[in-house]
Amino acid sequence: MDQFIKQDETGDLIETGMNVANHFLSAPIQGTNSLSKATIIPGVAPVLIGNPEQKNIQYPTASHQGSKSKGRGSGAKPIIVSSSEGGTGGTQIPEPLFAQTGQGGVVTTVYQDPTIQPTGSYRSVELAKIGKERMINRFVEKPRTSTPVTEFKRGAGNGSPRPDNPRGGHRREWSLSWVQGEVRVFEWCNPICSPITAAARFHSCKCGNCPAKCDQCERDYGPP
């Protein structure tokens, strides 16, 4: 009997293992089955089963995000990231992928080469590499003919959240997402006096020198 695992079998084993893990992680945890009361030493049952047996472990919904859990529970806990951009202002873009023309941005799709169809457990990884290469070639800076844009380097300067630009201008921003095997890109313009944020946001000019539109974002608003 051959005891060595072939390369094509490795992907199937990994995929099977991930499917099993996802099955158990997605299944709700029943509190009544989480502990066996018959095996617990008398006297310590209230401590061990007090929290898990009160109710099933529930993941927070959208209305409960940001709330802190009281006490300690068992099992996996969702990671809740507290917002650190509360004071940055601007209007957050709720779902950039479904933005329509006229909202100040444009959605494009980086289609994959139909002749390249990776298979197996690493299919998404290979497709992501292809999408990355196409995005790099897609967003090549072109010579600008009108509104100047200040070059921005994260971490440079005196740490001011707003780069100095007495003439005003716009900064092009992108939100990249991987959706059903395709790379979708939402792009829009923000005034260069606005802060750089991790979330996709529309900002208004604070310095009074930035134009309402530039040569890059004129097409974002559709025909005049």
Swiss-Prot record:
One GO CC term on file: host cell cytoplasm
GO biological process: symbiont-mediated suppression of host cytoplasmic pattern recognition receptor signaling pathway via inhibition of MDA-5 activity; symbiont-mediated suppression of host type I interferon-mediated signaling pathway
Residues annotated for Zn(2+) 1 binding in this entry: H170, C189, C214, C217
Compartment(s) where it occurs, according to its Swiss-Prot or TrEMBL record: Virion; Host cytoplasm
Residues at which Zn(2+) 2 binds: C193, C205, C207, C210
InterPro entries assigned: Paramyx_V_Zn-bd
Region of interest: Disordered: 57-98, 144-172
GO MF annotation list: metal ion binding
Annotated keywords: Host cytoplasm, Host-virus interaction, Inhibition of host innate immune response by virus, Inhibition of host interferon signaling pathway by virus, Inhibition of host MDA5 by virus, Inhibition of host RLR pathway by virus, Interferon antiviral system evasion, Metal-binding, Viral immunoevasion, Virion, Zinc
Function: Plays an essential role in the inhibition of host immune response. Prevents the establishment of cellular antiviral state by blocking interferon-alpha/beta (IFN-alpha/beta) production and signaling pathway. Interacts with host IFIH1/MDA5 and DHX58/LGP2 to inhibit the transduction pathway involved in the activation of IFN-beta promoter, thus protecting the virus against cell antiviral state. Blocks the type I and II interferon signaling pathways by interacting with host STAT1, STAT2 and STAT3, and mediating their ubiquitination and subsequent proteasomal degradation.
Family to which the UniProt record says this protein belongs: Belongs to the paramyxoviruses V protein family.
Quaternary structure note: Interacts with host IFIH1/MDA5 and DHX58/LGP2. Forms with host DDB1, CUL4A, STAT1, STAT2 and STAT3 the mumps virus V-dependent complex (VDC).
Protein name listed in UniProt: Non-structural protein V
Lineage: Viruses, Riboviria, Orthornavirae, Negarnaviricota, Haploviricotina
